[in-house]
Regions:
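Catalytic active-site module of serine/aspartate enzymes centered on a nucleophile-bearing elbow/loop
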Residues: 102, 109-113, 117-155
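Acidic beta-to-alpha connecting loop that harbors the catalytic carboxylate
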Residues: 77-80, 107-110
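Accessory cap/linker subdomain of secreted extracellular hydrolases
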Residues: 1-65
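Extracytoplasmic/secreted proteins, especially bacterial periplasmic and envelope-associated proteins
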Residues: 59-62, 66, 86-90, 142, ...
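Structural recognition of the beta-strand scaffold that forms the well-ordered cores
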Residues: 72-74, 102-105
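Short beta-strand/loop motif that positions the catalytic acidic residue
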Residues: 67, 73-75, 79
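Conserved alpha/beta-hydrolase "acid-adjacent" motif
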Residues: 80-89, 114
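Short helix-capping segments at alpha-helix termini
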Residues: 94-100
């Protein structure tokens, strides 16, 4: 089911990103949902622009194809910023022909690989990002084991 107003939100997002990529001032419309506004403000904040610009211009798949060293890509299934199915499946497919690339998809890891007890469907941007720097959440056990096993295999 389409989200009411979703097409207008996407058009405003696309326009803001086009301005950002072209190094023009970015106008973040006040009527966008808070999550989209915060994303755009964060990306286009002058202090973040060098990193954001480089990140935006990077083609991850091309970069992974060029890397010869061992690579571990860990995407938590409760990450609401990176889709483990959409993005992860592309990387997993590439890993089939690039033996230096390894992937792991821990069931309960969020974007920063911390344990997330809520179901994926219950997560929203504000709730998820507030837990990234919280003291209580711990590194997800499955994510940690994937990292340790990958490192151990390279001793």
């Amino acid at each position: 089911t389409p989200i009411p107003g979703g097409e207008a939100w996407l058009a405003a997002y696309d326009a803001a990103i086009a301005d950002f990529v072209a190094n023009r001032p970015v106008n973040v419309p006040a009527d966008l949902p808070e999550g989209i506004r915060m994303l755009l403000i964060g990306l286009t904040n002058p202090v973040n622009q060098p990193f954001s610009g480089e990140l935006w211009a990077t083609d991850l798949m091309q970069t992974l194809r060029r890397i010869q060293q061992p690579v571990l890509v860990v995407i938590g299934k409760k990450d609401i910023q990176v889709d483990w199915q959409a993005d992860g499946s592309l990387i997993a497919e590439l890993a089939k022909t690039h033996p230096n690339i390894h992937v792991a998809f821990p069931e309960n890891a969020n974007h920063v690989l911390k344990y997330e007890p809520l179901e994926r469907a219950q997560l929203n941007a504000a709730q998820a990002s507030s837990s990234y720097n919280a003291k209580a959440p711990r590194l997800d056990d499955e994510a940690l084991q994937a990292i340790l096993a990958w490192l151990d295999a390279r001793r």
